[in-house]
UniProtKB/Swiss-Prot annotation:
Stated name of the protein: Probable [Fe-S]-dependent transcriptional repressor
Purpose: May function as a transcriptional regulator that controls feoABC expression.
Similarity comment: Belongs to the FeoC family.
GO MF annotation: an example: iron-sulfur cluster binding
SUPFAM superfamilies membership: Winged helix' DNA-binding domain (SSF46785)
Lineage: Bacteria, Pseudomonadati, Pseudomonadota, Gammaproteobacteria, Enterobacterales
Annotated iron-sulfur cluster binding sites: C56, C61, C64, C70
Keyword set, alphabetical order: DNA-binding, Iron, Iron-sulfur, Metal-binding, Repressor, Transcription, Transcription regulation
Amino acid sequence: MASLIQVRDLLALRGRMEATQISHTLRAPQPMIDAMLNQLEIMGKAVRIPEEADGCLSGSCKRCPEGKACLREWWVLR
């Protein structure tokens, strides 16, 4: 079972990661990692960095039925 400290240490080693990458690396369930990242954000230890929509070459993200599901969300330590 992953701990909050392991999530923090992994971010410190890798620089920035997506929640899914953290989940796979630590072999922990995605909802648990999401909760830990939110807790680190509340504590002021981690920052969520959403990817900008200007990377969409076709400009169809606004009309995408998945509602910008293709945009990545990165996490970094503060």
